[in-house]
Amino acid sequence: MKKLKLRLTHLWYKLLMKLGLKSDEVYYIGGSEALPPPLSKDEEQVLLMKLPNGDQAARAILIERNLRLVVYIARKFENTGINIEDLISIGTIGLIKAVNTFNPEKKIKLATYASRCIENEILMYLRRNNKIRSEVSFDEPLNIDWDGNELLLSDVLGTDDDIITKDIEANVDKKLLKKALEQLNEREKQIMELRFGLVGEEEKTQKDVADMMGISQSYISRLEKRIIKRLRKEFNKMV
């Protein structure tokens, strides 16, 4: 089961990369003005109720008014050698994903869910940063966590068995990708599921898919390019 979960995560990630979506892309928060204050419980609740209806204004406010949370979490990783502005930018990607995928019906606060997504986005970036691995001692204290405990580099980088973090990563990106896939018709979805093994099966070649569907490989190739272009547009609307 564990190997299956990791394999499925890899397949989803592979498709995300095919769509041109990279988790380590950096988006900067410009300006020097003070960040807006957090929302009150009632204000947040009103905005959350509008999310399922696709209210983009509510989405934007929820993101903006939770930027202080991004800064707070980013400062936990200041001693990793990464510029604080970069950490905030990366964490903001996690915040956007959190707001896009948050389910108001679940018994969890947005701040709690967003904190996990923000921290996970930063952790994923740090894992891919070879400069940290080579220049900082693996057991060197980096900072103090929220509970007052020393935060070691080994805690930040984790291991391949860090299933909790992998699950958050998979759930956030897969949820966004599933929303994009829902915009496809049945044949288009079938092609993507077969090509990228999205339903637990092995990945199929274009020739395999063509044979299974009774059409030419060149036609499958053209369809796949068109579908990926469409998926990229749908995904970019949500991220």
From Swiss-Prot:
A motif (Polymerase core binding) lies at residues 86-99. InterPro entries: Cro/C1-type_HTH, RNA_pol_sigma-70_dom, RNA_pol_sigma-E, RNA_pol_sigma70, RNA_pol_sigma70_r2, RNA_pol_sigma70_r4, RNA_pol_sigma_r2, RNA_pol_sigma_r3/r4-like. Proteolytically cleaved in the N-terminus by SpoIIGA to yield the active peptide. CDD domains: Sigma70_r4. PROSITE patterns: SIGMA70_1, SIGMA70_2. Residues 1-29 form a propeptide. Keywords: DNA-binding, Sigma factor, Sporulation, Transcription, Transcription regulation. Sigma factors are initiation factors that promote the attachment of RNA polymerase to specific initiation sites and are then released. This sigma factor is responsible for the expression of sporulation specific genes. Belongs to the sigma-70 factor family. This is RNA polymerase sigma-E factor. It comes from Bacillus subtilis (strain 168). The gene is sigE.
